[in-house]
Amino acid sequence: MDNVAGIDVSKGKSMVSLLRPFGEVVAKPFSVGHTGSELKELANYLKSLDGETWVVLEHTGRYYEPVARFLHEEGIFVSAVNPKLIKDYGNNTLRKVKTDKADARKIAHYGLVLARGM
């Protein structure tokens, strides 16, 4: 996997963090609304990146479903991961930063680790 997009999905919008192997930042975290046009713009952006891009998001409630479905239908590899796995990943620090950007970055890092094991 050349790029991993970690997506923190909430009602109506998502925060996206894009990383390459070894944690290289592709772009600063950015927000995407759940409208067709914004999701299409996200899909086009992900497809324009060099190499293959894998999207990782938490399997939370029903909010993730339209995002995952849309990106999958656009031909992007999407994985929905149990939120407990994401929560437990990297919990070896005393500093607890809880923002949408930090969550998206954590999901992307988790995806990088998963990709190495594939």
What are these regions (language model features)?
Residues M1-M118:
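Phosphate- and other anionic-substrate recognition elements at nucleic-acid/protein interfaces
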